[in-house]
């Protein structure tokens, strides 16, 4: 199968890799460049576990044709921390026990980050809408909503983090 | 089979490539096609992409608006001229789906998807293919023969310019809250006073979105009151054969269609 | 979210020095979760990883005439196509590790398939895409067989045999019966004398656990002739034992690493991904990954099985339950997995948290041509509890009684005898009902509000029935009674049947018909024996088939002034301690 070279920015760092034709971004992030934070849940756009930001917009990396990120900027949970300090969203998720098995958490965090970047003071309804494409099977939605609202309340969640 | 992806900067090149490709499929936002690629759908050999800016444009053409086929649901929601369509775009998937899913892709979406097209059908939209300048195909005709249109590149969708956001009403009926696949969606365009000239379309009541022609006729000249719409509700599923699938049975769809149509027409909360 | 403690309840039974409950304690894995660094099985990268994809049956039930893998095997990137003959010991059942059930399920089927999606071949390839393309090229010549998808249709004579190990489509309990029995008192006699006999039928569909992380495993050759296996299993040692058995290797050659699971809910207890991935690694010498995609997780990932329950209650005009009879069917799907064991749990739970002096249950673990069923949260209990509580509402409505008061009246209380012949302790249903009513602003009578779990139980309510009617219905031959479903082995004589436990001597039921002289058919339903008559003086007229009116459990008296007790409540979660 023919391979194509692709260059993009991942959490602020330049990446160059070869992708197979038709390959999805999730696969390239995980196996191509070794960022294991986006998770495989369905490869059909229903679970949200692979959510990443592309040029600041939330996207499902399993439904993103890898070659289309050429020259663009991709952000994942791996870029949320600032040095040793957790991102305010990560801290709020911890404080609110907003993870049980932890598998949906990276997608939830990126969906939340996308929301707070364009809407730093969301209502509860807007938070629910923002994570409406992300499934948590451990049924932790209330804790997740509380964590996102709390991070928004701290006012600094939108601007922190690389990428 | 190994998939070949080709990208064209010009829409006419893309249209030519698609029509000559063996097992070719046009790539819109990828929300449906990538799923097929992830599953190694053996019917797909070539993917044709197009980066022509014309696909991303929203522009006025007299009393109509041409929405580029590559415009995403997120872009619809952000466009002031398309405010009447924002509530429809908002119920398509979650935010991450909406930043990829396109108007053109939705035209080809199989059930249970294609809610946006249901609204377009109620709006009497028409479809313009690449290379066509003046003419366009009524959406109803397009849908009737949809399978045979896959080999053509859609450039844009024409919709009437609507200033009163209440003139277009839409409901997506799901079992999962806040979001889930629709067991049915209903769109109603009420351009005049009362039911005059109204257009009603259903999603997921047939293999493609369909008009509720009998209900439309019954509403002609009627008032949008409980009494006025009674006949239309009786005729809500006349002429339709709703499917039985994993979301609902035919019986259930027939039972609840008038209930949701009533709420929609009376403007009652869903 | 806040937790409300009702510390006034059972206050004298606790010293109330709760060190952890009610106080948040950070989880040790939380930092890993919020940073995305928690190592799920698929987060281990291996150079040269190969991918495995199954060829699956499109039919519910079919014989395999032949499998042609030549086109698939020669495709680019394909390393190997694996068939059932490549599995060292291609028949297993998970609970054989507990001596509970017969091996009945191949890892990769060779002769026939019994559910849609059953694997018949596995492609190992350089990429997942190449594996999928090759799967599409495998040609299987199927002889489609009639199938059965309904539990009751599966156990009628001449129904298609789903599972050759159990030709009657029923799991065999204790080597003897087509179903698990519970006999406590005499429900028929009690029904005859009850004011109302009320029947209900309840059923639950299969439920997929749908973990966000699909089931999977990665195996790779390790040093010292060992294999390492990263897995999403919820039951590491079950998976280790199963892999060692199917692959016929010593378990110390397998190095299992698990523990971080992306949601399981029971569906990852009996996965077969580990033996499959290790087999791939053994056959190719390379790291191999076998994972379900989402469609497989939903279609062939073992769900909570469907259940169907018939519940019949005998009830007096004043609301006292005098008898409850269950006939239940668990849909095990095509193979045993865990349903047979779930039924043991279910029957131990009957008749629910109520004191009823006559209880009867026949519960069948039925094989159908559906996806094999397994555990899911509260398995064995959830389905029948739904049936019981729905039926409680139905009975309350039919006799014109408030449904909560009906429950309080019949609730078990400390010291009551349960149908599994142990005294109830640490009961708290009455208090739960009272608090639930209070929260729902549901008015209760003063009488119901005064009740409590500590008083009114015991005494006559602690007595076993004087007579329990037993039978040999569903008796089968050809299985050993030495274990739950043992087939007779040469040199291992069948043990004599264990005596039924009876508090007082009662007439023995007649013996089952003798076995045929030649190889016995697997099932020989016996005619019901004549109803035994009690010969001893009965103390509890309620459980005896005498013409006197049934005597329901003594209505609990109003509580005395709260006699202090210093027993420890909630001391045993599983109940095993008491055995």
Describe the function of each predicted region.
Chain B
Residues 1-270:
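C-terminal structural segment of proteins
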């Amino acid at each position: 199968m023919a391979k194509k070279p692709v260059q993009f920015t991942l959490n602020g760092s330049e990446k160059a890799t070869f992708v197979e034709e038709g390959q999805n971004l999730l696969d390239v992030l995980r196996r191509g460049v070794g960022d294991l934070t986006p998770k495989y849940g369905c490869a059909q756009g229903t679970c949200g576990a692979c959510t990443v930001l592309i040029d600041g917009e939330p996207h499902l990396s399993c439904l993103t044709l890898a070659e289309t990120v050429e020259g663009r900027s991709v952000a994942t949970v791996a870029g949320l921390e600032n040095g040793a300090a957790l991102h305010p969203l990560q801290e709020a998720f911890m404080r609110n026990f907003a993870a049980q098995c932890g598998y949906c958490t990276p997608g939830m965090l990126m969906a939340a980050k996308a929301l707070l970047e364009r809407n730093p003071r969301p209502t509860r309804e807007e938070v629910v809408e923002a994570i409406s494409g992300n499934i948590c099977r451990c049924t932790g939605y209330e804790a997740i909503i509380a964590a996102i609202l709390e991070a928004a309340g701290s006012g600094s969640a939108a601007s922190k983090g690389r990428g | 089979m190994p998939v070949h992806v080709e990208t064209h900067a010009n829409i006419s090149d893309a249209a030519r490539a698609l029509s000559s490709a063996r097992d070719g499929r046009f790539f819109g936002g990828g929300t449906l096609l990538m799923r097929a690629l992830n599953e190694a759908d053996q019917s797909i050999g070539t993917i044709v992409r197009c980066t022509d800016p014309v696909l991303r444009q929203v522009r006025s053409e007299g009393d109509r608006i041409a929405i580029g086929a590559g415009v995403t649901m997120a872009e619809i929601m952000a466009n002031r001229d398309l405010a009447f369509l924002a509530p429809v775009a908002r119920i398509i998937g979650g935010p991450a789906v909406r930043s990829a899913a396109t108007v053109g892709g939705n035209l080809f979406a199989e059930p249970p998807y294609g809610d946006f097209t249901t609204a377009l059908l109620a709006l009497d939209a028409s479809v313009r293919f690449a290379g066509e300048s003046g003419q366009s195909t009524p959406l109803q005709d397009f849908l009737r023969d949809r399978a045979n249109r896959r080999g053509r590149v859609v450039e844009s969708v024409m919709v009437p310019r609507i200033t009163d956001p209440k003139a277009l009403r839409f409901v997506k009926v799901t079992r999962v809250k806040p979001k889930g696949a629709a067991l049915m969606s209903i769109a109603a365009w009420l351009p005049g006073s009362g039911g005059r000239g109204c257009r009603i379309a259903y999603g997921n009541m047939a293999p493609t979105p369909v008009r509720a022609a009998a209900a439309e006729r019954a509403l002609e000249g009627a008032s949008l009151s409980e009494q006025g719409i009674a006949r239309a509700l009786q005729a809500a599923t006349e002429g339709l054969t709703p499917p039985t699938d994993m979301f609902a049975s035919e019986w259930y769809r027939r039972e609840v269609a008038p209930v949701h149509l009533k709420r929609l027409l009376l403007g009652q909360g869903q | 979210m806040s937790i409300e403690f009702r510390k006034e309840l059972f206050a004298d039974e606790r010293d109330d020095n709760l060190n952890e409950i009610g106080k948040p304690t950070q989880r040790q894995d939380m930092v890993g979760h919020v940073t995305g660094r928690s190592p799920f099985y698929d987060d281990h990268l291996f150079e040269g990883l190969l991918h495995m994809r199954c060829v699956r049956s499109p039919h519910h039930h079919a014989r395999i005439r032949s499998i042609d893998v030549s086109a698939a095997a020669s495709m680019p990137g394909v390393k190997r196509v694996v068939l059932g003959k490549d599995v060292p010991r291609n028949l297993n059942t998970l609970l054989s590790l507990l001596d509970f059930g017969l091996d009945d399920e191949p890892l990769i089927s060779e002769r026939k398939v019994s559910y849609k999606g059953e694997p018949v071949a596995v492609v190992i390839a350089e990429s997942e895409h190449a594996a999928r393309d090759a799967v599409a090229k495998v040609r299987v010549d199927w002889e489609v067989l009639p199938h059965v998808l309904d539990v009751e249709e599966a156990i009628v004579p001449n129904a298609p045999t789903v599972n050759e190990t159990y030709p009657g489509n029923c799991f065999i309990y204790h080597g003897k019966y087509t179903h698990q029995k519970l006999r406590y008192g005499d429900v028929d006699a009690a029904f005859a004398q009850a004011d109302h006999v009320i029947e209900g039928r309840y059923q639950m569909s299969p439920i997929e656990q749908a973990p966000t992380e699909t089931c999977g495993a990665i195996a790779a050759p390790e040093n010292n002739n060992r294999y390492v296996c990263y897995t999403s299993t919820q039951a590491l040692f079950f998976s280790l034992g199963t892999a060692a058995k199917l692959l016929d290797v010593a378990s110390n050659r397998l190095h299992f690493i698990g523990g971080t699971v992306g949601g399981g809910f029971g569906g990852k207890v009996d996965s077969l991904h580990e033996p499959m991935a290790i087999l791939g690694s053994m056959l190719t010498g390379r790291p191999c990954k076998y994972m379900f995609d989402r469609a497989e997780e939903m279609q062939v990932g073992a769900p909570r099985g469907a259940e169907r329950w018939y519940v019949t209650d005998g009830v007096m005009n004043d609301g006292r339950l005098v008898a409850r009879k269950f006939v239940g069917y668990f849909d095990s799907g095509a193979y045993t997995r865990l349903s047979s064991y779930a039924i043991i749990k279910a029957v131990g739970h009957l008749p629910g948290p109520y004191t009823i002096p006559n209880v009867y249950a026949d519960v069948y673990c039925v094989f159908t041509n559906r996806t094999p069923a397994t555990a899911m949260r509260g398995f064995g209990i959830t389905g029948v509890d739904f049936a019981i509580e729905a039926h409680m509402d139905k009975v309350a409505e039919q006799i014109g009684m408030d449904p909560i008061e009906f429950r309080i009246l019949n609730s078990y209380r400390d010291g009551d005898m349960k149908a599994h012949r142990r005294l109830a302790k640490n009961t708290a249903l009455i208090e739960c009902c009272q608090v639930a009513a209070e929260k729902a602003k549901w008015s209760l009578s003063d009488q119901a509000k005064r009740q409590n779990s500590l008083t009114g139980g015991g005494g006559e309510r602690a007595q076993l029935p004087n007579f329990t009617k037993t039978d040999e219905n569903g008796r089968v031959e050809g299985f050993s009674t030495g274990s739950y479903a043992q087939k007779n082995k040469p040199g291992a004589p069948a043990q004599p049947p264990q005596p039924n436990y009876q508090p007082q001597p009662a007439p023995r039921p007649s013996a089952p018909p003798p076995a045929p002289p030649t190889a016995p058919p697997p099932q020989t339903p016996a005619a019901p024996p004549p109803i035994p008559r009690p010969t001893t003086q009965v103390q509890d007229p309620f459980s005896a088939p005498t013409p006197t009116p049934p005597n329901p459990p003594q209505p609990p008296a109003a509580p005395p002034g709260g006699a202090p007790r210093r027993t420890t409540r909630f001391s045993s979660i599983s109940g095993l301690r008491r055995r």
